[in-house]
UniProtKB/Swiss-Prot annotation:
EC identifiers of the protein: 2.3.3.10
Top-level division of the source organism's lineage: Eukaryota
Organism ancestry: Eukaryota, Metazoa, Ecdysozoa, Arthropoda, Hexapoda
Name of protein: Hydroxymethylglutaryl-CoA synthase 2
Gene, per the UniProt record: HMGCS-2
Keywords noted in UniProt: Lipid biosynthesis, Lipid metabolism, Steroid biosynthesis, Steroid metabolism, Sterol biosynthesis, Sterol metabolism, Transferase
Length: 455
């Protein structure tokens, strides 16, 4: 190919989440913790819940099916499909191979891509791999599908930080949401902040304090690198003296284990901005010699920059947290659920032309920052209009979910814990509470082979 494909990015998005939820305020009362521990301390209002009828395969089957139907895409037009998930059912067989049964009727088996892991970063890794394919000599002009999906389940003491979801991105050229080339910044290190060494359990091992420090440290490394790379790229494009700071971006979207951490992350961006441009903050000159490593658990510093960043958070980040607040921690899905929340938070005319900064983090750890540009054409029938229109069902669907009592939620979690990886097994939950068109687990035979049906 003589030149790069133009405007490679997101052409369509499909987002699914559980039809059941538990109220976090009711969970506070049930767990006999102080009022506000989950709702104020974590910033969470509701949490999506999967019964034993739903697993990672069923979530992804549902999402792919709906993406293809809603966007009227022929399965023969897909040349790449990659799944980012840490919700592992099999150490050998990938989720991607399960999804290939949806392609059988079309006869299309020429689909590259496979599963990728590393905690909550893997959806971003799958996205980057799809971009590499489209910008390579192997690209044959077809679309790529990126799947970011997980079921987040914790032991009882950490259960309020769970959730579940699956998000698919249809990737191609001439997209209404363009992923900026040449400006990604990454930071990767070894840490035992969050990991899953017990393959017979759905529960992670978590060092909560270290996990927060790793997340914020990764942000501190990625943001200045990203700004520097963006400035250099724009200079090469003839845009001299373009200042890349907090004012350059129209929105900041973060990986969201819980909403309060995202609010703290915006405060870290302001801290970074202060370190880079101290003259902008005349009232903070006494802090000019501040060192990042001394600030992660300094509550006085945190409060100063939380207060300083409040307006920025409200304007440029809070609109991206609707699904995180209502569905919970979706692991690798959460960053892109934030993008969806942003896209459905305002009129399409207000979205047009915006530049969005994205921060992806996965424990262990791996992190990247990158940016998106939204098309300036928001006219009826435009690719941007079609993308956003195909997301209008999400807000009503959030309201249509069925509420569980905390006791019912606890019972569902106990059933999952007792029967995880059991074979043979027939799920006990009713499929009648699932949204229409949902794929669900019908049974597991003695050889651990899973059979699925659609509502």
């Amino acid at each position: 190919m003589a030149h790069w494909p133009e405007d490679v990015g997101i052409i369509g998005i499909e987002m699914i989440f559980p039809s059941l939820y538990v109220d976090q305020a009711e969970l506070e009362t049930y767990d006999e913790v102080s009022p506000g521990k989950y709702t104020m301390g974590l910033g969470q209002d509701k949490m999506g819940v999967c019964t034993d009828r739903e697993d990672i395969n069923s979530l992804c089957l549902t999402a792919v099916d709906k993406l293809m139907e809603r966007n009227n895409i022929d399965y023969n037009d897909i040349g790449w499909l990659e799944v980012g998930t840490e919700t592992i059912l099999d150490k050998v067989k990938s989720v991607k191979t399960v999804l290939m049964q949806l392609f059988e009727e079309s006869g299309n088996t020429d689909v590259e891509g496979i599963d990728t892991i590393n905690a909550c970063y893997r959806g971003t890794a799958a996205l980057f791999n799809a971009l590499i394919w489209i910008e390579s000599s192997s690209w044959d002009g077809r679309y790529a599908i990126v799947v970011a999906a997980d079921i987040a389940i914790y032991a009882k003491e950490c259960s309020p930080t769970g959730g579940a979801g699956a998000l698919l991105m249809l990737i191609g050229a001439n997209a209404p949401i363009v992923i900026d080339r040449g400006v990604r910044a990454s930071h990767m290190k070894h840490a035992y902040d969050f990991y899953k060494p017990d393959l017979m359990s759905e529960y992670p091992v978590v060092d909560g304090k270290l996990s927060v420090q790793c997340y914020l440290s990764a942000l501190d490394h990625c943001y200045p690198r990203f700004c520097s790379k963006t400035e250099k790229y724009l200079k090469r494009c003839g845009k001299e003296n373009t200042k890349i700071d907090l004012d350059y971006f129209d929105a900041f979207v973060f990986h969201s284990p819980y909403c309060k951490l995202v609010q703290k992350s915006v405060a870290r961006l302001v801290l970074n901005d202060f370190i880079q441009y101290p003259e902008k903050y005349q009232d903070l000159q006494q802090l000019r010699n501040l060192k990042f490593e001394d600030t992660y658990f300094d509550r006085d510093i945190e409060k100063i920059f939380m207060d300083k960043s409040k307006q920025l958070f409200e304007k440029k980040t809070k609109p991206s947290l609707m699904l995180a607040n209502q569905v919970g921690n979706m692991y690798t899905t959460s960053l892109y659920g934030g993008l969806v929340s942003l896209l459905i938070s305002e009129d399409i005319g207000e979205l047009a032309g915006k530049c969005i900064c994205m921060f992806s983090y996965g424990s262990g750890f791996a992190a990247s920052m990158f940016s998106l540009h939204i098309s300036t054409d928001s006219s009826p029938g435009s690719t941007l209009s079609r993308l956003v229109t195909n997301l209008t069902h999400i807000k009503p669907q959030v309201q249509q979910r069925v509420k569980l009592s905390p006791g019912e939620f606890e019972n569902i979690m106990e059933i999952r814990e007792q029967n995880h990886h059991k074979a043979p097994y027939t799920p006990v939950a009713s499929p009648n509470t699932l949204f229409p068109g949902t794929w669900y687990l019908e049974s597991i035979d003695s050889m651990h082979r899973r059979k699925y049906k659609r509502v």
